[in-house]
Amino acid sequence: ARVAGDGFGFRYQYLAGGSNTGTGWASWNPNGEFVTHYVSESAAAGVTPVFSYYMIRQSIPGASQDEPQGVRTNLQNVATMRSYLDDVELFFERAGASGSTVVFHFEPDLWGFVQQSSQDDDGRTFKVAVGSTQQKYANGRPDNAAGLAQTVVAMRDALAPNVVLGYHASWWGTGEDPAYSNPSDHRMRELAARSAAFYESLGTNFDVVFMEFSDRDAAFKQYVYGDGGASWWDSDDF
């Protein structure tokens, strides 16, 4: 529960469960009304809702595979992507109806896996079922990662101009994770340039960029994953 006057400006909620499983966010309340209620409750509390949309991983058939392969499998499956794009459309319909500011953090991790599977950091070289789904906002768009990004932006523009659209820049998408490699400043600039080039290859513009530090804290990785303390930050990390 939020206490009035506590000073927080945002609260966030993951939308998950897969687009074709029958247990995704759209089923949490009838016909996607979970988003409607969450936005309304946020506005009443004086905070901006942030939704992290994490649906491709748990969709079928890729959910049974390891995460990188499962994401790729789902992105290239026409039936899966049709249900997925319909699900994204439902979100924008619900969020757009509110008229208040909503932040949509679109698919953390997806872009990192796609970048690693692309040629020369070019999202247009990675196949994604987009136009071939015949989903109305995807018609005529290329069957690649750029087509996916362009479709999501087009949906937002048409259905929910009040939604701030967030791109997730996975800093490990280059294949090198700076959290572990401790790169020099020069090397870090090279990696950043590659991440920027991948984003630019998508041929459209999001509004804000999200980036992770870690998905677990350093002590968890040391004692549960047994990484020997490699995840702890030092003075060179910032």
Language-model features, listed with the residues they occupy:
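N-terminal carbohydrate-binding/catalytic regions of secreted carbohydrate-active enzymes
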Residues: 1-94, 231-237
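Short, surface-exposed basic-aromatic patches at helix termini and helix-loop junctions that form
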Residues: 2-6, 40-43, 96, 119-126, ...
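Surface-exposed substrate-engagement region within the catalytic domains
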Residues: 3, 24-27, 143-238
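Structural preference for beta-strand elements that scaffold enzyme active sites
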Residues: 8-12, 46-50, 101-105, 162-166, ...
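Solvent-exposed loop/turn segments at secondary-structure junctions
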Residues: 16-20, 55-59, 108-113, 170-175, ...
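A solvent-exposed, charged loop/short amphipathic helix patch at secondary-structure junctions
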Residues: 62-79, 117-146, 223-237
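An active-site-proximal structural segment forming one wall of the substrate-binding cleft
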Residues: 70-106, 136, 140-159, 188-205
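Active-site groove signature of glycoside hydrolases
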Residues: 91-138, 163-169
